[in-house]
Regions:
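Charged, flexible cofactor/metal-binding loops and thiol motifs
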Residues: 53, 273-390, 404, 408-410, ...
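P-loop NTP-binding/switch modules centered on Walker-like glycine-rich loops
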Residues: 78, 92, 212, 216, ...
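Helix-to-loop junction immediately C-terminal to a conserved catalytic motif
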Residues: 91-92, 450
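Conserved ABC transporter NBD signature motif
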Residues: 99-110, 458-469, 479
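Conserved ABC ATPase "signature" region
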Residues: 110, 162-181, 290, 466, ...
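ABC ATPase NBD coupling module
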Residues: 111-128, 154, 160, 276-281, ...
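Conserved catalytic motifs of ABC-family nucleotide-binding domains
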Residues: 207, 560
């Protein structure tokens, strides 16, 4: 078996996968039509709770849905909405302390009533799961071939030889190169994307009728994410399984789901076909969730509308509709009576909202009045009119690491070229985003900037000072105040033993500020990042993810830096919280004339709040320029592949646009090609004439400017 290559999708060439809802294939609640096939999985009144010191945590409250053969149900919602608890309940993987009620019917059998022994005979055979973290699903001391062989032999009467042959075929099916040899390798010898392919192979090994994928692409680059989603779709088609796809990425849902269930506070609040839900959401929560999503597919910079407030605690849910405290169109009845999940007249699908009929009739906007949410859009035109001074200048930056072998007596066997000749400038009031796959050198570049030491090669200048000229610790400390960092995970960045006040006071005290100065500065910092001053007395554990990230930003701003380095500042946040933080960063940049150097993998977010982009691959910048220029007219084939892999939260456009799926894995930076670093994966190289192909193999391309004279620059022989 071999992995079928990806192909463009469009009206004449529809993408793979099950049929979409339509007259002959109705979605949920679509009304009269041909009889639907019997569901392979039916969930009825599913309830999951966990004990806690404050009382029972109601994680899942009365969830109902049917999963049809060959179709994909996407489950979306904020953290804590009950998505993962639902997935674990389906698989029978809830912890022993959890309390489960309701029915989970698979082929007429109630999984909720089974003990672990009976469930073990069903898991992996009739229902398979793709986990978020592939390493948690793979035994590190067994080769991947042996893992697959064992999964096959547990449920089938196979000899070791036959099981091994089927394991090799499964690896081939999910796109593992040289599957017979790679079957002998161990999980740690695979990249993250390759490990996820192995997990998918495990999930489909026995051709289950149901697959459950819980955030299967969360930690992956966009190019690898696109590959994994294609593999998952192919696996579903090969096995004929129905798929439950749990994700926070609405673009992934738009491109791969047939039906969508939106969860909030432990229950489904809207359930409809994917086209209907994205085109005309009926539940106010769904409408606000979609309004908070940035999109990379359009040059129109609409404002992001974050959802006000925080999700309710599952220990103390409010009376009535759980979303009422955050809803812009809530009425008194919404605060006293919880609505049932019903189908409004004239609309497909089901929704739990007292005002659903008004929304369905078009007499009420589910997102509320235009002024009900504060939203900002970047003023790039103003930034171009008033360019600030250069805050950071990097020229020909080089960073290498030794490659060693041996446990005790290490010997050097090679050199890993992490960053090679990188150069850029960042001005006051400007955001430069470094984008690219993992291993491209983005984070190493950030670390070299933050070291404030002479680099291995090249030059780094911060606030007009060449870091190579710093001779004393006092000079370094003085320059350190000009550049600060906001880390990816605010939980890891904040000392859990300190209150917010002490966390913000720490950098001020380290700089020698007295008690009076500290006490006057901290309230202003909290105001600056939009936090109530009462938060100062709390510990990080008592804050939401968005609040913790705001504290991290306030801490970085404590000493009034000119440059903020942001390392994936949004990847650990829900989409609604992400919109709040994006809007905050845009406002702070404008008000304080800050310069931002950002590393991010979400190109939709990058498009929203960056002014310029530098695309990195294997330690080299292969293309750079103004954000809108890069998105509108990408030149380098790697940039084109990156942009084509970004999911769009629009089912029609997402399923019809052409994709460029890169072949193979990014090569090791310890063995760089002699010519272009992208040559082994470049689609243009495969189509070029022999003279260009020879140059690509033997000569490193120089960076050239676009013909229009703009600052758009790229390095490619084939253009």
């Amino acid at each position: 078996m071999t992995l079928a290559p990806a192909r463009p999708t469009g009206p004449e060439n529809p993408g793979p996968g099950p049929e979409r809802p339509g007259p002959e294939n109705p979605g949920p609640g679509s009304g009269p039509g041909p009889a639907r096939p019997a569901p392979v999985l039916s969930v009825r009144d599913l309830r999951v709770s966990f004990p806690s010191e404050q009382g029972p945590v109601q994680a899942v409250r009365g969830v109902d849905f049917d999963l049809l053969p060959g179709r994909t149900l996407g489950i979306v919602g904020e953290s804590g909405s009950g998505k993962s608890a639902t997935a674990l309940a389906l698989m029978g993987l809830l912890p022993p302390a959890a309390h489960l009620e309701g029915r989970i019917l698979l082929g007429g059998r109630d999984l909720a009533a089974m003990d672990d022994t009976r469930l073990a005979r069903i898991r992996g055979k009739d229902i398979g799961m793709v986990f978020q973290d592939p390493m948690s699903a793979l035994t590190p001391v067994l080769s991947v071939g042996r893992l697959l062989s064992q999964a096959l032999r547990v449920h089938q009467d196979l000899s070791r030889k036959d099981a091994w042959e089927q394991a090799v075929q499964l690896l081939d099916l999910v796109g593992i190169p040289d599957p017979r040899e790679r079957a002998k390798a161990f999980p740690h010898e695979f990249s993250g994307g390759m490990r996820q392919r192995v997990v998918i192979a495990l999930a489909i090994a026995n051709k289950p009728s149901v697959l459950v994928a819980d955030e299967p692409t969360t930690a992956l680059d966009v190019t690898v994410q696109a590959q994994i989603l294609e593999v998952l779709r192919l696996a579903q088609r090969e096995s004929g399984a129905a798929l439950v796809l749990i994700t926070h990425d609405l673009g992934v849902v738009a491109g791969h789901a047939d039906d969508v269930a939106v969860m909030y506070a432990g229950r489904i609040v809207e359930h409809a076909g994917v086209d209907e839900l994205f085109a005309r959401p009926t539940m106010p929560y769904t409408a606000r969730l979609l309004a908070a999503v940035p999109t990379a597919g359009s040059g129109v910079q609409r404002p992001l509308l974050p959802i006000a407030g925080e999700p309710p605690s599952p220990v103390a849910l409010p009376a009535g509709c759980a979303f009422a405290p955050r809803c812009a169109v809530a009425r008194d009845v919404c605060r006293t009576t919880e609505p049932d999940l019903t189908a409004p007249a004239g609309r497909p699908g089901r929704v739990a909202c007292h005002r659903a009929q008004e929304i369905a009739d078009g007499t009420l906007d589910p997102a509320g009045p235009a002024g009900s949410a504060v939203a900002l859009t970047p003023d790039r035109a103003a930034a171009r009119r008033t360019p600030g001074e250069v805050v950071l200048r990097v020229e020909d930056l080089v960073k290498t690491f030794p490659v060693t072998r041996g446990a005790l007596l290490k010997r050097r066997t090679g050199t890993l070229h992490a960053v090679n000749g990188v150069g850029f400038e960042v001005r006051a009031g400007e955001t430069l985003a470094l984008v690219g796959e993992s291993g491209s050198g983005k984070t190493t570049t950030l670390r070299e900037v933050l070291r404030l030491r002479a680099p291995e090669g090249g030059r780094i200048e911060v606030a007009g000072t060449d870091v190579a000229t710093l001779r004393s610790a006092a000079q370094v400390r003085e320059l350190r105040s000009e550049v600060q960092i906001v880390l990816q995970d605010p939980t890891d960045a904040l000392d859990p033993r300190l209150t917010v006040f002490d966390l913000l006071a720490e950098p001020l005290r380290a700089a020698g500020a007295d008690r009076t100065a500290v006490r006057s500065r901290i309230p202003r910092l909290l105001d600056l990042v939009g936090l109530d001053r009462a938060v100062g007395d709390r510990f990080p554990a008592a804050l939401s993810g968005g609040q913790r990230q705001r504290v991290g930003i306030a801490r970085a701003l404590a000493r009034e830096p000119r440059l903020l380095v942001l390392d994936e500042p949004l990847s650990a946040l829900d989409v609604s919280v992400q919109a709040e933080i994006v809007n905050l960063l845009v406002r702070l940049k404008r008000e304080l004339a800050l310069a931002y150097l950002v590393v991010a993998h979400d190109l939709a977010v990058v498009r929203y709040f960056s002014d310029r982009i530098a695309v990195m691959y294997l330690g080299h910048i292969v293309e750079s320029g103004a954000t809108e220029e890069i998105f509108a007219r990408p030149r380098h084939p790697y940039t084109r592949a990156l942009l084509s892999a970004v999911p769009l939260p629009d089912p029609q456009r997402e399923r019809r646009r052409e994709r460029i799926v890169l072949r193979g894995e990014q090569p090791s930076a310890a063995r760089l090609p002699a010519g272009c670093v992208f040559v082994d994966r470049c689609p243009l190289h495969r189509e070029a004439d022999e003279s260009v192909r020879t140059r690509c193999r033997t000569e490193r391309p120089s960076t050239v400017g676009a013909p229009d004279g703009s600052d758009h620059r790229y390095a490619c022989h084939a253009l």
